[in-house]
């Protein structure tokens, strides 16, 4: 059983995301949508209220719902992405190529993400036509952003109750369990920052107290000057 898991607050990008799911993703997916009553026309859709006040808890809650309903494969999606005709096909192909015993997150690339996940990243090597040659490779990384990312429910680890740094900490916790994270060749368009806005300093400062109290070793590593 496979589920697409989405949490939203303002839902302003949902109609386009929903249209791309309807057009391009197989109907064996059940869509879990927290924060909106939108029902997709071709996919079984389960909606719920999103009462959480941060990204981490918003997704923890809706992921728990999907897991409790017996879904083993989860495609966790931000509410402001758009699938292409080839996203799922490419991601499914890559899942078959990655060793399963220690597979954690398998994330798509996008045009609004950090590091290697971003197709704008300046990769080594020559361009291959209209792409970077490295876009044709599956890349193992320490941290991914689950903008659109696949995970097995048995490997799920809760996000901390944060907006920023929630994905960093979750990925580190999963690595401690022996799991590895990968960037797929698959791609989604990502609008970006539709809920929290473009406020990096403010969002960082809001996360520091929790990290200092609960993950002091990471606070020492990340915020020495704060």
Model-derived segments and their meaning:
Residues 86-105:
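Conserved donor-nucleotide/metal-binding helix-loop-beta segment in metal-dependent transferases, i.e.
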Residues 129-151, 163:
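A recurrent flexible, glycine/aromatic-enriched loop bordering the glycosyltransferase active site
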Residues 161-226:
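C-terminal catalytic/acceptor-binding lobe
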Residues 49-66:
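Glycine-rich, basic loop-to-helix element that forms the pyrophosphate-binding segment
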Residues 104-121:
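Short beta-strand-to-loop element that shapes/binds the nucleotide-sugar donor at the catalytic cleft/hinge
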Residues 72-82:
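Short beta-strand-to-loop acidic/aromatic patch adjacent to the donor-nucleotide binding site
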Residues 1-20:
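N-proximal low-complexity "stem/linker" segments adjacent to membrane-targeting elements
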Residues 19-28:
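Short, acidic, metal-binding catalytic loop of nucleotide-sugar glycosyltransferases
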